[in-house]
């Protein structure tokens, strides 16, 4: 093949990719459906020599490593799109020399799940705290609150993998289990782990995490490609990030706020201050009302985005229904908070004035008139609000080097960076 032919083919492929990204398939009619799979770790297997000695052993280890990486890539694809049942191998992300031998079974009912976890008679005292959390997730997936969201998703099916790590939770013996089975969403698949919730009273935390990940699976939005959460790969609800990342996580946190008052209180309290990651990866923290932060800065904080959606949902007439409609109507890859808010304002002009007031309050009056119109358009309700308020004097304020220390109790969440599009420290390539 000539160089010219290669360029032509590359151009065609690139054009096709761009077209698909900018023109996604229309949202399917009907509702999403969950497919639950229960998988249990049966053994941790060594799949390569961790300390090869001599050139021959090193050569064999190298070849084996290449083969394992190829097999691991195919395994990740198959677990997402074709989970299947029976004996499976799950390759470690953190230790290239080990893999997990699993037994995977499609869950038919709650009674079946209890049987798989060793409580066929329904005696929940036989379950570990982590197993009880998996049961709580399964039950919440059947709740009315989750069912009401099913038609928001553009996917026909979402696989949910309940990973039971019982017997392998000792971090000293099995240090990689927590990270290798970290709760996440790859879009088509949601992964939940008993290890992560193996403590008393973890049911609600597990359910909130499931709602968070389900919300990611419903969302087409692609986060920024390069370090969406900064150098450390972590994020928290009050961290200054970037526009699409803030939307992706804000949408997921908003859904948690709807179902769980504890999450609502946590997020609303946290966003009174903002965490800013510096070049060296360290954080500083500043009050949200501090002049060093602009209104647009605050719109790139996921918890602020979440609370705006929550207030619209809870304070405006039929707000929840309208928020979900705005989400469905703007579900494209490059969506931002601006797109969804504008879409809401255009479809619901009678709410525009109240919406502008919420936006103004959640950004502490820092958005200029031009910025309010940037997010909401120039409808009569928006213009009426702007005429009645006193706009801030400056449109742009630079963020200086900050020095306030970060509270050690709020260090964010590590992103599991194994996934595709969804963005959460719990979505592959995403976060919670």
Q: What role is predicted for each listed range?
A:
Residues 54-76:
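Low-complexity, intrinsically disordered, cysteine-poor segments enriched in small/polar
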Residues 12-21:
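Bacterial N-terminal signal peptides
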Residues 123-192, 199, 203:
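Auxiliary, metal-adjacent structural segments of Zn-dependent hydrolase domains
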Residues 24-29:
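Sec/Tat signal peptide C-region and signal peptidase I cleavage site
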Residues 208-224, 249-253, 257:
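Active-site recognition of the HExxH zinc-binding catalytic motif
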Residues 2-12:
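Bacterial N-terminal signal peptides that target proteins for export
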Residues 30-50, 70, 74-133, 139, ...:
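Fold-level signature of zinc-dependent metallopeptidase catalytic domains
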């Amino acid at each position: 093949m000539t160089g010219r032919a290669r360029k032509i083919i590359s151009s065609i492929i690139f054009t096709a990719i761009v077209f698909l990204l900018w023109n996604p398939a229309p949202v399917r009619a009907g509702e999403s459906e969950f497919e639950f799979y229960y998988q249990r770790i049966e053994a941790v297997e060594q799949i390569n020599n961790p300390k090869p000695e001599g050139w021959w052993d090193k050569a064999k280890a190298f070849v084996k490593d290449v083969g394992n990486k190829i097999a691991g890539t195919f395994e990740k694809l198959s677990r997402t799109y074709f989970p299947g049942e029976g004996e499976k191998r799950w390759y470690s992300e953190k230790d290239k020399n080990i893999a997990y031998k699993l037994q995977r079974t499609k869950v038919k009912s709650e009674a079946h799940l209890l049987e798989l976890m060793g409580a066929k008679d329904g005696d929940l005292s036989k379950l570990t705290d982590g197993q009880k959390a998996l049961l709580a997730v399964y039950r919440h997936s059947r709740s009315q609150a989750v069912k009401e969201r099913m038609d928001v998703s553009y996917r026909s099916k979402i696989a949910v993998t309940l990973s039971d790590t019982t017997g392998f939770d000792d971090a000293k013996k099995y240090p990689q289990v927590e990270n290798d089975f970290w709760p996440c969403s790859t879009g088509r698949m949601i992964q939940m782990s008993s290890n992560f919730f193996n403590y008393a009273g973890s049911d609600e935390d597990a359910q909130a995490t499931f709602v968070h990940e389900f919300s990611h699976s419903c969302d087409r939005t692609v986060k920024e490609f390069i370090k969406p959460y900064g150098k450390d790969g972590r994020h928290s609800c009050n961290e200054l990030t970037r526009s699409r990342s803030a939307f992706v996580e804000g949408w997921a946190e908003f859904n948690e706020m709807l179902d769980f008052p504890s999450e609502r209180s946590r997020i609303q309290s946290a966003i009174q201050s903002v965490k800013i990651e510096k070049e060296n990866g360290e954080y500083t923290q500043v009050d949200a009302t501090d002049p060093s932060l602009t209104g647009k800065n605050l719109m790139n904080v996921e918890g602020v985005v979440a609370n705006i959606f929550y207030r619209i949902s809870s304070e405006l007439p039929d707000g929840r229904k309208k928020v979900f409609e705005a989400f469905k109507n703007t579900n494209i890859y490059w969506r931002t908070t601006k797109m969804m808010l504008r879409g809401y304002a255009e479809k619901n002009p009678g709410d525009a004035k109240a919406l502008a007031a919420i936006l103004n309050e959640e950004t502490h009056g820092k958005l200029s008139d031009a910025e309010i119109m940037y997010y909401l358009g120039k409808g009569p309700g928006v213009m009426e609000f702007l005429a009645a308020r006193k706009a801030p004097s400056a449109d742009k304020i630079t963020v200086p080097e900050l020095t306030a220390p970060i509270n050690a109790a709020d260090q964010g969440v590590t992103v599991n960076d194994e996934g595709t599009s969804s963005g959460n420290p719990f979505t592959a390539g995403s976060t919670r």
